[in-house]
Amino acid sequence: MSGPYTKIDLDKEEQDFQNQIKEIEEWWSQPRWAKTKRIYNAEDIAKRRSSLSSVPASNQQAQKLFKLLGEHAKNETASFTFGALDPIHITQMAKYLDTIYVSGWQCSSTASTSNEPSPDLADYPMDTVPNKVERLILRRQLFHDRKQREERLSVSKQERAKLPYTDFLRPIIADADTGHGGITAIIKLTKMFIERGAAGIHIEDQAPGTKKCGHMAGKVLVPVQEHINRLVAIRTSADLFQSDLIAVARTDSEAATLLTSTIDKRDHYFVIGATNPDIPDLIDVLTEAELQGKYGAELSQLEADWSKKAGLKLYHEAVFEAIDKSSSVKDKQAAKDKFSAKVGPLTGTSHKEAAKLAKEILGEEVFFDWEAPKVREGYYRYQGGTECAIMRARAYSPYADLVWMESKVPDYQEAVDFAKGVKTFTQTNWLAYNLSPSFNWNKAMSPDEQETYIKRLGKLGYNWQFITLAVLHTTALAVDNFSRDYQKIGMKAYGQQVQAKEIEDGIEIVKHQKWSGAEYIDGLLKLTTGGLSSTAAMGAGVTEDQFKDH
């Protein structure tokens, strides 16, 4: 065939294709993937990869994280960390903590690529958090690793034994929010995270357009299967780009109150409906009131009045109430037990099936309308809770490495219940826990309980725990205190409360020129000029010589 095409060796093309399929199958047969479910095969991935492909550098970090979490799970301990904002944070964190977190909340408030701050609504450009990851790992973690490596390998092995060593390449887990769009957006976002250096990402089951911080009200969930599709998209993207990326499935269902759709029967048990057949739909009441010129507080009062009359309940509550009132059902507890045996939070029974069973038990239908209470944005009312979170976590677990229930308070018993509910279903999944600064820790528990909380959670299987906004608060506290004292006592505040404390605690940033890499860059300069440079930054006369004894 002639024409404006490139000649290709078909036999080699086919051989390369088959070899890649075999390589993928061998990859997937490793213990790493023992608990991972895929809905596609190796051929599906191989045919969609580029002819020019390579394993990303971040894959080493993903493998490192997987091994680390496995060790913590075996030892019933936890990797506990907090969200980093700046390279200064990661260099100090790396000395003590074995993972790093990158928070979407912190990025939203301080690092949006739109340069417009916002609360945690995930309304920033989708490259915001990946860019923060790149700034922290590709541009900073690697730099400090190179700097340390040059310093250590410039002396003998015996001398290196006396030098402190820090693993600056701590694996990063980053916040993917709800994925910033549909399936293709999630595939692209995952690729961004892999390319920028993330070892893992977490994604939550809220609706993207109404996403809220896990500790805000008004959270809207997507159906169970829709979030599973997101998790599959993450793994598909990671497979396409040859990454062992760790996937964390978060559910916000413990405190959620709304649902986008009733398409998934696993959600039906938790959908709220009206049990009063004599009231109009809420949206009709509100629309009519708006046409009459009512707004604001008047509409809120109308909705509250409507809700009181509607008899809002879950379907099983309506059935139990009907059983209690029924004169034809003699053994009421037996009737309830019969219904509960097939209709429960974890049975996945559809509303249609539940209604059929209720009619069989009662001899008549139980009125229940989940369309009537829909809110003006079109969402269904939903009653979440721990059981709901367990149901969702179980559904997500085959497609994720860790599952995480966002919670309202640091309730240890709730953590026990969730862990038991998930572990009963799957022994293989690790759990994650948000040690949120949104909690009032001093109201929630005593200082002694605070000290042991991480360890107690670790024994339950919460092998990765994190404080989302610790550096936001610690930075504010430190700068506020220093500013206050600086205003009062001038340079004494810096000399005594900062510099002297840095020296006392051995914090290397007291020599900030060295910390920033001045000696390392001098070495590169001398390397390219034959070992001599009159413009070396750390040469004779450098001010930092004043700290040579520290």
UniProtKB/Swiss-Prot annotation:
The record's GO molecular-function terms, alphabetically, read: isocitrate lyase activity; metal ion binding; methylisocitrate lyase activity
Q: Where along this sequence does the record place binding of substrate?
A: S103, G104, W105, G214, H215, R250, N434, L435, S436, P437, S438, T468
Decide whether keyword Membrane is in the record: no
Pathway-wise, it operates in: Carbohydrate metabolism; glyoxylate cycle; (S)-malate from isocitrate: step 1/2
| InterPro entries found in the cross-reference section | ICL/PEPM (IPR039556), Isocitrate_lyase (IPR006254), Isocitrate_lyase_ph_CS (IPR018523), Pyrv/PenolPyrv_kinase-like_dom (IPR015813), Pyrv_kinase-like_dom_sf (IPR040442)
- What cofactors are annotated for this protein? Mg(2+)
- Identify the keywords attached in UniProt to this record, alphabetized: Glyoxylate bypass, Glyoxysome, Lyase, Magnesium, Metal-binding, Peroxisome, Tricarboxylic acid cycle
- Provide the catalytic activity annotation: D-threo-isocitrate = glyoxylate + succinate; (2S,3R)-3-hydroxybutane-1,2,3-tricarboxylate = pyruvate + succinate
Which PROSITE patterns has this protein been placed in? ISOCITRATE_LYASE
Matches recorded under CDD domains? ICL_PEPM
The cellular component terms of Gene Ontology attached to this UniProt record, alphabetical and capped at eight, are: glyoxysome
Q: Which cell locations does it reside in?
A: Glyoxysome
In this protein, the active site sits at C213
Its domain of life reads Eukaryota
Q: Name one GO biological process term.
A: tricarboxylic acid cycle
Q: According to its UniProt record, where is this protein mainly located?
A: other
The record's Pfam families line, in alphabetical order, gives:
ICL (PF00463)
Report the EC code(s) recorded for this entry: 4.1.3.1, 4.1.3.30
Q: Which residues bind Mg(2+)?
A: D175
Record note on quaternary structure: Homotetramer.
This molecule's function is given as: Catalyzes the formation of succinate and glyoxylate from isocitrate, a key step of the glyoxylate cycle, which operates as an anaplerotic route for replenishing the tricarboxylic acid cycle. Required for growth on ethanol or acetate, but dispensable when fermentable carbon sources are available. Also acts on 2-methylisocitrate.
Report the sequence similarity comment from the record.
Belongs to the isocitrate lyase/PEP mutase superfamily. Isocitrate lyase family.
What name does the UniProt record give this protein?
Answer: Isocitrate lyase
Q: Which organism is it from?
A: Komagataella pastoris (Yeast)
